[in-house]
Amino acid sequence: HGGKDPGTVYKDIYEKDINLSISLYLEEYLSEYGATVVLTRDSDNDLSYGETNHRKKTDFDNRIKIINNEYTDMYLSIHLNYLSNKKYYGAQVFYNKDNENLAKSIQEYLNNNLETDREIKEIPSSTYMYKKLEKRGVLIECGFLSNASERSKLITEKYQRKVAKVIAEAVVNYYK
């Protein structure tokens, strides 16, 4: 998400903005641990260039190129969830291919530090972007924008930083 693609929306709250904030904080924390972080975006843009009928595919293809480059060890795809049933809440990790152990490790940290009890889920193998990724990594839904209580936290810098810090600690622990 980014640029013309807002992701999920609740009134004037856009997933793309919260994702970007969490990603920038995550970059900060991982860098403090000594990691070299490459962001697919560091501002409100997407990776489609110009006006195109295939904007989403172009965006995905450009993200895939960044992630699959020879210097990348891992990807963390940051998102927010949204369901019509507003009772659901909590950060949840989705994985593809051989990334189940990484997903379990990060989910455990999220559950222990963000008051959730979600379980990991596999990304369907037909999902365009994730079937083309060659690197270790996961998609992290950092919470539900559809849940009023969680939404009220997700829009705050304090909680965005907390989510980013927990993810960073989980990644560092995974490599220990």
Regions found by a protein language model. Give the residues of each.
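A short, glycine/acidic-enriched catalytic loop
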Residues: D5-I13, N81-S105
